[in-house]
């Protein structure tokens, strides 16, 4: 079946046009296109058309913690949020450190069929930081794993990290680092600063992140490797990234929506929903992260979507499991923090939420131009809509959103994966 998207503005630019999708590709773009007899018509008058979003950092919890999320519910949240591809992190149970697990995740994602679920392979066996996994076997498997990370913990041994970068370079795959020097964060649950001191919470210094980013930039330089920094959170990290890029080092970085919008003032409530790793930092850090995303020092937005069940969050702050939902709220938070103040345009949104992450992960069919003949991985956005976040109404199996009851701008009105409508008007299209 073909799909006709009526009255849309590609990249939010120019006059309204119709876009005809047929056989998984963009077939025609132009004003007042004829409606094919079998076409599914989407009235998107005045809406913005973007390439489907790509999330380099999600936690879908399958296998092992399906009570908090699974690939089906996570895929639904992703499609409703405008995503056509997501990367599922390796800290599952069992850990995704072998083709048995990574291929399962890939096949399950294909079975659900709402987004392309790309498994992230572990860098070290069991995330223990001691022995490299068989990255080559995972890359050669059905999932063709192209990114590896011990996210949740840092590959803190510099020799292991150096060997991982060298191994990855030979395979043409990417190492994504959770930048946290663990000896600086023992017992830490909040950003090290006045707020943590006032609340009596153990502090997590910026240097724990900055020191690993600096170290890994140098290791990547010497190995001739690519390295990707997960969830940058500190202003000092921005300065290190800028220095490394100026040196020609192949380093990329992501920022989460929650680090763009929120800061550690929220911790005053002691609500476990606000506990996340790395922690919410000071308002000045959020300002620096927004500017870095606008300037291209930070390359992309990634959600770090991390579902947790109620019993894991509704406890005292230090005992709460770290992490927040992000897939369905990501676009709206980026619009509020970046588009509304004029830091990014809609074309820039395509760059940081689709094109750059697809390029970083080397996905050939995602983040493509909105042109005839290109794959129809598409997101339609109503830029003028507003909505109120209610965790219980989100598609995720968990409800741990830090944006509960917030009014946010912009809604995803349709998502298409290879020409198939996966989500429309807030509902999944199976």
UniProtKB/Swiss-Prot annotation:
Its cofactor is Zn(2+). It catalyses: (S)-dihydroorotate + H2O = N-carbamoyl-L-aspartate + H(+). GO terms for biological process: 'de novo' UMP biosynthetic process; purine nucleobase catabolic process. One of its GO terms (cellular component) is cytoplasm. Keywords: Hydrolase, Metal-binding, Pyrimidine biosynthesis, Zinc. It comes from the Bacteria. Its EC number is 3.5.2.3. NCBIfam families: PRK09357.1-1, pyrC_multi. This is Dihydroorotase. The gene is pyrC.
């Amino acid at each position: 079946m073909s799909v006709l998207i009526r009255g849309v503005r590609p990249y939010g630019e120019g006059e309204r046009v119709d876009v005809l999708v047929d056989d998984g590709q963009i077939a025609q773009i132009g004003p007042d296109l004829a409606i094919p007899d079998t076409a599914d018509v989407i009235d998107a008058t005045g809406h913005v058309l973007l390439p489907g979003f790509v999330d380099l950092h999600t936690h879908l919890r399958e296998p092992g913690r399906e009570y908090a999320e699974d690939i089906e519910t996570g895929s639904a949240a992703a499609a409703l949020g405008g995503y056509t591809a997501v990367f599922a992190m390796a800290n599952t149970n069992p850990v995704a450190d072998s083709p048995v697990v990574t291929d399962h995740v890939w096949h399950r994602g294909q079975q659900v069929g709402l987004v392309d679920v790309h498994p992230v392979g572990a860098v070290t066996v069991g995330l223990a930081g001691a022995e490299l996994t068989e990255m080559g076997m995972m890359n050669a498997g059905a999932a063709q794993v192209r990114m590896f990370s011990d996210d949740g913990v840092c590959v803190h041994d510099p020799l292991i990290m150096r060997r991982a970068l060298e191994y990855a370079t030979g395979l043409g795959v990417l190492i994504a680092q959770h930048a946290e020097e663990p000896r600086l964060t023992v017992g830490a649950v909040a950003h090290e600063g006045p707020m943590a001191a006032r609340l009596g919470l153990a502090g997590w210094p910026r240097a724990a992140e900055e020191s690993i980013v600096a170290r890994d930039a140098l290791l990547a330089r010497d190995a001739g490797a690519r390295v990707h920094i997960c969830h940058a959170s500190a202003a000092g990290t921005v300065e290190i990234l800028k220095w490394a890029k100026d040196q020609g080092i192949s380093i990329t970085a992501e920022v989460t929506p929650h680090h763009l919008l929120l800061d550690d003032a929220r911790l005053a409530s002691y609500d476990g929903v606000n506990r996340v790793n790395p922690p919410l930092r000071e308002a000045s850090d959020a300002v620096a992260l927004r500017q870095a995303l606008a300037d291209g020092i930070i390359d992309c937005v990634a959600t770090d979507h991390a579902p947790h069940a109620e019993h894991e969050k509704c406890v005292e702050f230090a005992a709460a499991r770290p992490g927040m939902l992000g897939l369905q709220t990501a676009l709206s938070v980026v619009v509020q923090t970046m588009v509304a103040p004029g830091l990014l345009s809609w074309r820039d949104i395509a760059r940081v939420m689709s094109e750059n992450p697809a390029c970083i992960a080397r996905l050939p069919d995602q983040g493509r131009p909105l042109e005839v003949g290109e794959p129809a991985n598409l997101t339609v956005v109503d830029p003028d809509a507003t909505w109120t976040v209610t965790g219980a109404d989100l598609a995720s199996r968990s409800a741990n959103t830090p944006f509960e009851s917030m009014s946010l701008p912009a809604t995803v009105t349709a998502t298409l994966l290879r020409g198939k409508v996966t989500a429309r008007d807030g509902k999944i299209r199976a």
